[in-house]
Amino acid sequence: MRQNRRASMIVNRILITLIVLVSLSFLFLRAGPKFSEADRACIQDEWQENKSLNVSSEINNETYQIVFADVQKEFKWIFLPKEISGNPDILMIVSSNRDNFARRNVIRKSWMNSDKNKIVAEKRMKILFLVGVNSENEKENTVVLKEAEVFGDIIVVDLEDNYQNLPYKSLTILLYGQSKTAESVKLIGKIDEDVIFYPDQLTPLINDGTINMSISAIYGEKWNAGVEVSNKDETNKWFIPKYSFKCQLLPSYLSGPFYLTTRKAAERILKSTKHRKFISVEDVFITGLLAGDVGVEKKQLPSMYMYDETTTDTAKAEILAWHNFKNNAEFLESWENLRLSRCKACRKSRNFRGSRSQLDEERNQ
C-alpha cells in the first residue's frame, strides 16, 4: 500500500514538473527574438492606402463583403437567428464545422446551458454558432439549415469551411456582432468548438476592470512581438508567403482559439482589412496585424490555456478557457468536473447545481 502511494506521489510530481516545463517553454516562445524598430518599420511599410477600395461591411441585408488589398469577396447570410432578445453585454460566437452536430450539442449542454451558467441565465451573454456551407453540397446544407431552424442558434453563411478561410470566418463573426446586434452588445467573443469555457469567470474580470468593454481592446492569451514568421516550408500550417508579408518577425497577437473583442475594436478592425494583403494565419492576421494597424490594445487574460499540454484535468489552477483535443464525452465530463474544482465564479453562482447526477442523465440521453 505504501509503495503504491509512494509511486503515485512520484508520478504526480513528474506530471507537475512536466506541466511547469511546458508552461515555461511556451512563455519563452511567446517572448520570441528581440523585436526592433526595424521590425516595426517593416510591418508599417506593408500597410497600403487603397482609397479606392470599400471597407469590409454589409452590402445589404442578405450579403456582405470582406475586403483585402489583394482580394475582395462577397458572401451571403443564408440563415440568421431571430433578433437577439434582451440587452446582452456579450455575444459569443462559436466557429463551428458544418458536420459537427454532436459537438454543438455538447456545447449546448455545457457552457451554453442557462441552467449551469448564471451569466447566460441572466441574458447578459448570448451564444451563437457560425457555420459555413458549400453551396454545391445541397444534401449536407439541408441538414445544417434544419438544425438552424430547430435550435435557432446558428448563423449560416456560404463560406466553405477550411483552414485557408478562417480569416473570412472570424471577420464574419466581428461583422455580425457589429452590424446585426443591438448597441447593448459591447463585447464580441470568437471561440473554437474545442475550447472548454466557463462564461461566469468573465463576471469578476469585468467587475474588477480587467476587461473594459468601453475601450478599443482585444483580450485573450497574448504572444509578445518577435515570434518568427514561417515563410519557408509551404506545408507548415502557419506558412506565410513572402509576397503576402515580407517581414521576418510578427507583432504581438492573441491565440486564435479564444479571444474577446470590444465592439469599438471590431469596428476598427473591419475598416482596416483593405490595407493589408490576405494572410491565412487568422490569429496573427486579425489580432496582430489588423488590430495593431488601428491602435487596438492587446491584453492578456488570466487562466488561459490555449495549448492542450499547458494544463491537465488533475491540475488545480483556475480555468477561464482551455483549448484541448478531447472527444465529445471527455469534453462534457471535463467541463462538468472542472466546474466543481477550478471555476471559482461558478461555485459562487446561484445557478450552480450539482452536476454529477446531471452528467449521468445527459450521458444516457
Curated annotation (Swiss-Prot):
Lumenal compartment segments: 30-365
Molecular function (Gene Ontology), one example: hexosyltransferase activity
First-level EC class: transferase
Segments passing through the bilayer: 9-29
One GO cellular component term noted in the UniProt record for this chain: Golgi membrane
Pfam families: Galactosyl_T
Keywords: Glycoprotein, Glycosyltransferase, Golgi apparatus, Insecticide resistance, Membrane, Signal-anchor, Transferase, Transmembrane, Transmembrane helix
Any coiled-coil regions, as ranges: none
Membrane-protein topology: Single-pass type II membrane protein
Topology feature Cytoplasmic, residues: 1-8
E.C. no: 2.4.1.-
The protein's annotated pathway: Protein modification; protein glycosylation
Family: Belongs to the glycosyltransferase 31 family.
Protein name in the entry: Beta-1,3-galactosyltransferase bre-2
Taxon lineage: Eukaryota, Metazoa, Ecdysozoa, Nematoda, Chromadorea
